[in-house]
């Protein structure tokens, strides 16, 4: 990993955020804004193969016309990492819904202090090293940080 990426905020992106970003009717939605922040290298957006598969499956079922935008966003904005192995999940049992546990573990293993999702309740009680928040809340935090540069 290059030195510049070590100083960028690292954010793990869940499938619902990818879906919302790809399907966004506006350029100003929080999900798409987060992906654009990654595209212009202000943050490092990370996700896992499980997340990509889930988002793509949901888009195929509900909004197939958004698939080209989704694939472009994935290629330009995200670093996609391997899913945790099943044997790596045991120590994390009970920290998130069983279906979402691999996502929480992947976020922690990748050193992402933030996991962005609309399904915050699925990641409760969570892990102390990963703050789970909605896309709009992350955008507000970024805005506050930028305002502090004055």
Give residue ranges: language-model regions.
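Short, well-structured N-terminal submotif of metal-dependent ribonuclease cores
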Residues: 1-45
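A residue-level structural signature of the nucleotidyltransferase/glycosyltransferase Rossmann-like core
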Residues: 10, 44, 115, 130-131
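A secondary-structure boundary/capping signal
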Residues: 13-15, 48, 119, 134
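Alpha-helix capping/helix-boundary segments
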Residues: 17-18, 51, 103, 121-122
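Short, flexible helix/strand-to-coil boundary loops that buttress conserved ligand/catalytic motifs
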Residues: 22-23, 59, 127
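PIN-domain endoribonuclease scaffold, especially VapC-family toxins
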Residues: 36-91
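Active-site neighborhoods of divalent-metal-dependent phosphate/nucleic-acid chemistry enzymes
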Residues: 78-115, 120-121, 149
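Acidic, PIN/NYN-like endoribonuclease modules and their adjacent C-terminal/linker elements
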Residues: 101, 113-114, 120-150
């Amino acid at each position: 990993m290059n030195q510049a990426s070590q100083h960028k905020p690292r954010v793990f992106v869940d499938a619902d955020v990818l879906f919302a970003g790809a399907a966004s009717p506006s350029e100003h939605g929080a999900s798409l804004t987060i992906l654009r922040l990654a595209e212009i290298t202000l943050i490092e957006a990370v996700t896992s193969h499980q997340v990509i598969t889930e988002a793509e499956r949901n888009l195929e079922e509900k909004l197939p016309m958004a698939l080209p935008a989704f694939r472009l966003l994935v290629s330009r904005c995200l670093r996609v990492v391997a899913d945790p192995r099943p044997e790596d999940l045991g120590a994390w049992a009970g920290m998130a819904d069983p279906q979402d546990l691999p996502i929480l573990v992947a976020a922690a293993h990748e050193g992402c202090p933030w996991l962005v999702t609309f399904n915050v309740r699925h990641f409760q009680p969570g892990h102390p090293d990963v703050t789970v928040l909605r896309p709009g809340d992350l955008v507000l935090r970024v805005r506050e940080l930028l305002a502090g540069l004055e």
